[in-house]
Every structure is written in C-alpha cells, then in structure tokens.
Amino acid sequence: MAPIISVFGTSRAAEPEQVYRLAHELGAELARAGFRVATGGYGGTMEAVSRGATEAGGEVVGVVASALSSQANQWVRETIVVPKWEDRLLRLVALGDGYVALPGGAGTLAELAVAWEMIHKRLIPPKPLVALGDFWRPIIGQIESADGNSRGLVQVSMSVREAVAALSAALLPGSLAQPISTRELS
C-alpha cells in the first residue's frame, strides 16, 4: 500500500489565494508521485490538497472531529470521524508516513509541533517532516536555537517540487527522486 502523507494547513484559505493554489499543487504532486494523502478533512488548504490529489487520481483520507463537524469536504474519499480536535490531530500524526506543513495559523503550528515533538521524543519512528516555504523558517529557527536536539528534524522546502522530492527519496523504494538541497536556516 502506498505511503500516506499527512498535510497540515489552515481552514482559512480560499481559491484563488496563493496558499490555496500551493496546497492544490501539493496534493496533485503527492498523488502523481504515488502517495496517499491525509488532511484534517475540512475547507481551506485541507480542501485544496484533497482536491489536487483527487483530480490527479490519488486517494484522500479526511480526519474530522465530530465536536467540530462530521462533514468532510467533497474531495475526501475516505472519512475518519473522531470525537475531538485533539483526537483528530493525533490520528493525522499516526496515519502519516511523512508530513508536510503548509503556511497556516495556530492550529497548523500545533500540528507541526506535535509531529515534530513526537519524532524528537521517539514516541513515533523517525519520519520525514517538511515545512513548505519561508513562512515557517523563523519559527523553526527559534525552536532549533532553543533546543539543539530538535535541529534537523524538520526540512524547510522552498517549493512543492522540493518537498515531494524529499518525501519520495525517503519513502518510495526505488524512487529516482533525489532530495533537493534546501537553504540553511539563518
């Protein structure tokens, strides 16, 4: 079975915003590379990733919390309903063989932080964790400065192509993709 990439992102984005288009491109490229995609299942970038993956022929899992809404976006093909937001977050982390964090708000930051800390504390096996774009660079830099042991666990990728190449190299046996070097955090 194809590896699952859990994608973290905001519900507060709409077409034609740049972050929505970025998320759509990410979903499509993940599907084309052979990944299944999991998202929080709702609107915004979660919808855009789901839409991109579905339109590219991929499989999409949406994890929704009944405390928020049990209705996933129309592009989700498999819906997992859990009781609470925190259950949803932990299920997305458990489902993922790798992760991508899109630009987002406090909820997206919480998702990125939980995956990062669970890898750091070895509560889950090491998995590729990609932060997409410059948006996350200052936050990751500050955390890595404060805690050197967390350094290198999150890769900042400057493009969808770079992010998918890194995930493919790590997770797809026989992949011809080579990780594309990223810019160092300053």
Where are these regions (language model features)?
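Active-site/ligand-binding-proximal alpha/beta "capping" segment
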Residues: 86-123, 130-131, 176-181
